[in-house]
Amino acid sequence: MEDDGRLAPRQIWARPTSTTTRSYVPGCTPFLLPSDGYVYLNRTYSISLGENAIYDPACTSTPTTTEHAGAALDIHDPFYASVTPLLYAMGCATVVSYLLVIILLITPRTFYVGGPGGGANFLGRHGMVSGSYSNNSSVVGVGGRPWLQKVAALLVAISLTIATADSFRVAEKQYDHGYSDAEALTSEVIDGTEIKVVRIISSTFLWLAQVQTLIRLFPRHKEKVMIKWAGFALIVLDTIFAILDKFLVKTNTTRPRLYEDAIPALSYLFELALNLLYAAWVIFYSLSKHRFAFFHPKMRNICLVALLSLCAVLIPVVFFVLDIAKPEIAGWGTYIRWVGSAAASVVVWEWVERIEALERDERKDGILGREVFDGDEMIEVTPSEEVDWPRQQFHGHDRGGGTGMSSAWGGVMGLAHRPLRPRGGRITQTQREAEGATAAKSRKRRSARPTPPPAAVTPVSRADTTSAASTVYNVHYYPVSSPTPPVAMPFMEEEDEGSDGDGEKELAVVQNQQSSLPTQDTYTEPRRQNSPQIVNVDNRWRFILNPFKNRHAALPREVASAQAEEEGFLSPDDQAPRQGDEENPHYTPRHRGLFSFHPMSDGASRRQSGADQPLPVTVIPARRRGQDTWSPQWFTNSNLVDRSSSRRTASRPRDQRMKVIQPQVQSAAPWTAADMEASFSSMDYELRYDPEAAALVSEDIPDHHSQPTQADSPAHPTMSGGNGPSGGETQSALDTGPGIEGSVNEGSVIEGPEESHSQR
């Protein structure tokens, strides 16, 4: 009976007494635990098996729930998707974020010190006061960070600090439970409420800082405005969709490829577009500034800054692509993109500062400033401050970059938009009289030549122009021993080359119309408005334009003969003006009526003569507007000649040294038949203007060249006049000369000896 209670060993499995079979659910089948082993229930309690044991799981209809479904060590994911690379990446990102904060807040300014030998020294602290260096200093300030970058970098550092703390907390929890899961760690940390809020705020300031950096890269004001508003619109859209994605849809952040809704896809799209546009424009700027952006002898470490800048702008774009291609690295790639966006603004700003410092150093000795475009309202703003968002100006030490240089360049750029102001203005009639009375005492030099009128587009009629009324032409004679006078440059004033005060000449304005004419007041104002403006320029220009100024050339014999008669023409008693001459409207003081092309040659001739003697002056008045010009038809058409002879009046001035030709009051021919016979009967030659002699010379008198230079030689043929009417013969002689058309116009003053007409 005792054997009935015992079971054979085979009956444990087979149970031969039972005629039914039992089926087990997969995973619920009992299994044997061999002897000589241990069964661990927890870390402190274990059971030793002295013999075999059977484990029969309690299978139910519902599966057993566990807190963590992963195994103790998940070996299915690669190493770069494990917890260890994730923690290292977060630690590095946090350290970089704090370095950016240190760069922005603790060391706000750096300086570029370029020596005369081309050397460079950066990161040298030379004081915190901007603009404390002179313009000649080679120290160029680089720095001055905008407050948007400071706020963005500080928020990124705070966000990464919170994320790092949460990551270590979750990793420790997984270690306590004996497993490690990187995906679970990332989901628990990034999907936290505090990280979501801080990340949205910091991302908004990061985009604003990047837009501010882009605004600085482009010089045109229109481009700055366009970038500002386009970037602001993209930032608003990205922020709105990010808020909807984080708090409304609550999608899987670590698996961007598994997006099934439109809101997270749009948020991802706007974020990717902002990073792509920023990277593209920074690369374009670096290529446009390739002379300074990648390497420069004065700043050899700029290549390192360029490398860091390019990496900072490309890291967000690269990790956006990797998030789609390899979702396993999306866990720690998010932190890299986060800190990369902060570095893309801070490092690129430093790069731009150094590029502009090199540009300022290169053009500091030039005369050109920075480019100014149409609509640019930031001409005199420093580069570091011109793109700042609205804020109050402080006089702190970290505002603006290179303010010492910008103050100097602001004045240079302002000169480019202001016309040159002449140093000598227009002279009124009262000023002329006052200067004429005191010119002998003051001895002030003025411009040697007036400003030439601008070139006309179409041919101008000589009868309609009013410029001849204010034009003065001077003809001087020089002895054979004097050098050829140099050609004076317009807008230039010759310096006093000698101590002899008699050699100083002044610009003369001759009033060549009588006060009795009714049209005198009509043309006074236009002539005054058309008067030339005088600008004093350095004397060294004369040598550049005329390097052969010391060349000596012999003058024609006619000029030498006229100069010989000029030296002994007047006596010292005639130098004082008579009382009646001052009342004459045609009276002009001698010191105002003379004009010198070269004071040295004129002073030499006067020292040879031993006396300061004035020259006689012939005044050719200007023709009225609308008056007919001289025509060869008057020689053949007697009607024109007879009609003009009845209207012309002649009078002689009181001063015998001056010949005044009366203007034509009506529109009539200036000559009569008798005048032409008297004028041209004894004149069988023509006059031409010789630029070397600066005088009117004859071409038809060959015997003058063979006669020696004497005091009684014939005078220069420029001084015409005779027994006919006082001014008619002179004007006819001047008008008949083929070379006088371009050299002697109406209103001309011709100086020369008076005996010339008596000898002819």
UniProtKB/Swiss-Prot annotation:
The keyword Transmembrane applies. GO terms for biological process: cellular response to pH. Required for the proteolytic cleavage of the transcription factor pacC in response to alkaline ambient pH. Might be a pH sensor. Pfam families: PalH (PF08733). It comes from the Eukaryota. The gene is palH. It is a multi-pass membrane protein. It comes from Emericella nidulans (strain FGSC A4 / ATCC 38163 / CBS 112.46 / NRRL 194 / M139) (Aspergillus nidulans). The chain crosses the membrane at residues 86-106, 151-171, 195-215, 229-249, 263-283, 302-322, 329-349. Residues 492-501 have a biased composition (Acidic residues). Residues 629-642 have a biased composition (Polar residues). One of its GO terms (cellular component) is plasma membrane. It is found in: Cell membrane. Belongs to the palH/RIM21 family. Its main location: membrane. Residues 575-585 have a biased composition (Basic and acidic residues). This is pH-response regulator protein palH/RIM21. Residues 1-85, 172-194, 250-262, 323-328 are extracellular. Residues 389-465, 479-503, 559-615, 629-666, 696-760 are annotated as: Disordered. Keywords: Cell membrane, Membrane, Transmembrane, Transmembrane helix. Signal peptide: none annotated. Residues 107-150, 216-228, 284-301, 350-760 are cytoplasmic.
